[in-house]
Amino acid sequence: MKSNNILDIETENINKNSLDIDKKSTSEIIKIINNEDIKVAYAIKKELNQISNVIDLIFERFKKGGRLIYIGSGTSGRLGILDASEMYPTYGIDQNRIIGIIAGGNKAIKNPIEGAEDNEKLAIVDLNKIKLNSFDTVIGIASSGKTPYVLSALKYANKKDALSIGLCMVKNSEMTKIANQVISIKTGAEIITGSTRMKAGTATKLVCNMITTTLMIKLGKVYKNLMIDLVATNDKLKNRAFKIVKQLTSAKDQIIYKALAESNFSCKHAIVMILRKISYNESVLLLENCDNSLTKLLEEKV
């Protein structure tokens, strides 16, 4: 067994606020948990400038065709997969543009795979499977900042001239010696000692939300605060698409239904078709001339 002093890091410390949690009532337990969770957003707030810098770096590569790749083990890997999997239905982004990889493969999503997080070679194999290239960004997620699988992924990203980003929950981690940029959120000791699926996991999810949501906004996938590139794969989303078009055009229902049907339920194109009184094909050309940004088209009167 290799030792990387995992027990010396902040996320493994004893939380003095939950020392007697096993003796508390249900209401007392959840108050302790809630009080600790509140601290997560404040910890992230301290790193907003760095998160912003990282997003701008990712965006520059992404708009040139690069991909965003989350990679991690255990909870960290699962959270990356969760965030990546939401991008297609919410924003209509190609499913191969934002990818989540977990140590041990798909089986590890539900069940722990023994030794996967310590396997440095496995990270290289996994990144080779997706043909990592210099336009890509690799975000290695590890609460401790020390997971061998994740550190290996960041090293390999450097070798391939991809952008390497570390996301961890401690300061001055091993990631700072490897990654091009590191986002370090100091979440501190967990309520249950070492259970980083809790505060560390919450912080990871919030940061991933920030990264991908901001990226999608900058790519023109949002108008005002509406998801105009959603993929209407069920009745709920079709109703949402109708509501979005209605809100932005105030058109009669039959006109909206017709535009959505002709545009394969593309809110963005249906909106342009109605407001400019043009065909679907014409709306495609018009949006292409505006970098597919409805904001540019409507606000700049193109």
UniProtKB/Swiss-Prot annotation:
Catalyzed reactions per annotation: N-acetyl-D-muramate 6-phosphate + H2O = N-acetyl-D-glucosamine 6-phosphate + (R)-lactate
- Which GO MF terms does the UniProt record name? carbohydrate derivative binding; carbon-oxygen lyase activity; ether hydrolase activity
State whether keyword Cytoplasm applies.
Answer: no
Active-site residues annotated for this sequence:
86, 117
Q: Which gene name belongs to this protein?
A: murQ
Q: What is its EC number?
A: 4.2.1.126
On assembly, the entry states: Homodimer.
Q: What class of enzyme is it?
A: lyase
> What extra comment accompanies this record?
A lyase-type mechanism (elimination/hydration) is suggested for the cleavage of the lactyl ether bond of MurNAc 6-phosphate, with the formation of an alpha,beta-unsaturated aldehyde intermediate with (E)-stereochemistry, followed by the syn addition of water to give product.
Any idea where the SIS domain is?
58-221
Q: Which family does it belong to?
A: Belongs to the GCKR-like family. MurNAc-6-P etherase subfamily.
Gene Ontology biological process terms, A to Z = amino sugar catabolic process; N-acetylmuramic acid catabolic process; peptidoglycan turnover
| Pathway of action | Amino-sugar metabolism; N-acetylmuramate degradation
Q: Which Pfam family, an example, fits this chain?
A: GKRP_SIS_N
The keyword Glycosyltransferase appears for this protein: no
According to its UniProt entry, the function of this protein is described as: Specifically catalyzes the cleavage of the D-lactyl ether substituent of MurNAc 6-phosphate, producing GlcNAc 6-phosphate and D-lactate.
Q: Can you name this protein?
A: N-acetylmuramic acid 6-phosphate etherase
> InterPro entries per the record?
Etherase_MurQ (IPR005488), Glucokinase_regulatory_CS (IPR005486), MURQ/GCKR (IPR040190), SIS_dom (IPR001347), SIS_dom_sf (IPR046348)
Keyword set for this entry?
Answer: Carbohydrate metabolism, Lyase
Query: Which Gene3D superfamilies does this chain map to?
Result: 1.10.8.1080, Glucose-6-phosphate isomerase like protein, domain 1
Top-level taxon: Bacteria
